[in-house]
A protein has these predicted regions:
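Short beta-strand segments
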Residues: 34, 180, 245
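Conserved core of the PLP fold type I
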Residues: 57-207, 217-219, 227-234
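Short catalytic/ligand-binding loop motif for oxyanion handling, primarily in non-cytosolic enzymes
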Residues: 39-43, 186-187, 219, 252-253
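Conserved core segment of the aminotransferase class I/II
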Residues: 79, 235-274
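Walker B catalytic acidic pair
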Residues: 214
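N-terminal "arm"/small-domain region of PLP-dependent enzymes with the aminotransferase-like
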Residues: 2-75, 79-82, 86
Length: 274
C-alpha cells in the first residue's frame, strides 16, 4: 500500500468555498460577503498609500535578505508593543513584554496555543459562543479540550454579559480564556470598559489565563479605543497574559500575513526565558 493511499480528502474550507462560488456566479449584482477583505467598486483590493510609500522606501534601501532572528524584525516587534501597550508603557520599560513576529494572527494564535500546551498540559480552553471557527481548531490541534462560554444572545442581538460572567466564574484555575479584544468575530458585539473591568476581575479571582485575540484594531472606534482591553488588563495588575494580533487587514496586506504574538510576564527575567 502506498504511503498516502489511506489519506482522506479533507472537507473544503467553507469561506474559500464561498469565494469560489462567488467567482463562478455570473450575476452582475452579486456581492461577496465571504472572505473578509476590503474591495473597491471594481472588486479589487486597493493598496493603501501608506503601504505604497513604505514599500518604496524599503525597495530604495536595497536591504539585505539575511536570516532574521527567531522573534523576527526587531523594529517591527517594538512598534507592535508600542501600539498595543502605549509608548510610555511601564510593562515595556520594565522588560515584561516579549513580542515575536508571526505569520498573521492565525500564526500568532498557533504559536501561543502550542506554547501554552507545554506550560499547562491539562488545561481547558474556553472560547466565546460563537467565535471565529478557527479558534477551536487551533487549540484542539494543540491538544487542548475546548469549551464555550456564553456570549451572544440571539433574541436581543447583543451581548449576554451575565451569562458570560457566570460561565467564566465556573472555570477551574489555570483554564485559558480566549477573549476578543475588539470587533468580536463573528457577532461584532463588544464589551464596554465597565464590562472589561468585571471580566478581568473574574480572571484574577479564578486564576485564569487571559489570551487576547485582536485582528481588527482600529476598525470600530479607532486605534486607541479598540486597544483599550489590552491596556485595561495591563493596568489591572494581571502579571501574565498573552496577546495575538494581526495587521493583515489593517494594512490590506492579506497575503503578506502580518501578525505578532506578545507575552507579558511578571518580571524581565521570566519574560526573557519565554
Amino acid at each position: 500500500m502506498s504511503l498516502f493511499s489511506a489519506v482522506e480528502m479533507a472537507p473544503r474550507d467553507p469561506i474559500l468555498g464561498l469565494n469560489e462560488a462567488f467567482n463562478a456566479d455570473t450575476r452582475t449584482t452579486k456581492v461577496n460577503l465571504g472572505v473578509g477583505v476590503y474591495c473597491n467598486e471594481e472588486g479589487r483590493i486597493p493598496l493603501l498609500r501608506a503601504v505604497i510609500e513604505a514599500e518604496t522606501i524599503r525597495v530604495a534601501q536595497h536591504a539585505s535578505r539575511g536570516y532574521l532572528p527567531i522573534d523576527g524584525i526587531a523594529a517591527y516587534d517594538q512598534a507592535v508593543q508600542k501600539l498595543l501597550f502605549g509608548n510610555d508603557s511601564p510593562l515595556i520599560s520594565a522588560g515584561r513584554v516579549i513580542t515575536t513576529q508571526a505569520v498573521g494572527g492565525t500564526g500568532a494564535l498557533k504559536i501561543g496555543a502550542d506554547f501554552l500546551k507545554q506550560l499547562l498540559p491539562n488545561a481547558v480552553v474556553a472560547i466565546s459562543d460563537p467565535s471565529w471557527e478557527n479558534h477551536r481548531a487551533l487549540f484542539e490541534t494543540a491538544g487542548f479540550p475546548v469549551q464555550n462560554y456564553t456570549y451572544y444572545d440571539d433574541a436581543s442581538h447583543g451581548l449576554n454579559f451575565a451569562g458570560m460572567l457566570a460561565d467564566l466564574q465556573k472555570l477551574q484555575p489555570g483554564s485559558v480564556v480566549l477573549l476578543h479584544a475588539c470587533c468580536h468575530n463573528p457577532t461584532g458585539a463588544d464589551l464596554s470598559q465597565a464590562q472589561w473591568d468585571q471580566v478581568i476581575a473574574a480572571v484574577q479571582a479564578g486564576g485564569l489565563v487571559a489570551f487576547l485575540d485582536m485582528a481588527y484594531q482600529g476598525f470600530d472606534k479607532g486605534i486607541a479605543q479598540d486597544g483599550q482591553a489590552v491596556r485595561i488588563i495591563a493596568e489591572a495588575g494581571i502579571d501574565s497574559f498573552i496577546v495575538a494580533n494581526s495587521y493583515s487587514k489593517s494594512f490590506s496586506l492579506y497575503g503578506e500575513r502580518v501578525g505578532a504574538l506578545s507575552v507579558v510576564g511578571p518580571d524581565a527575567t521570566s519574560t526573557k526565558a519565554v
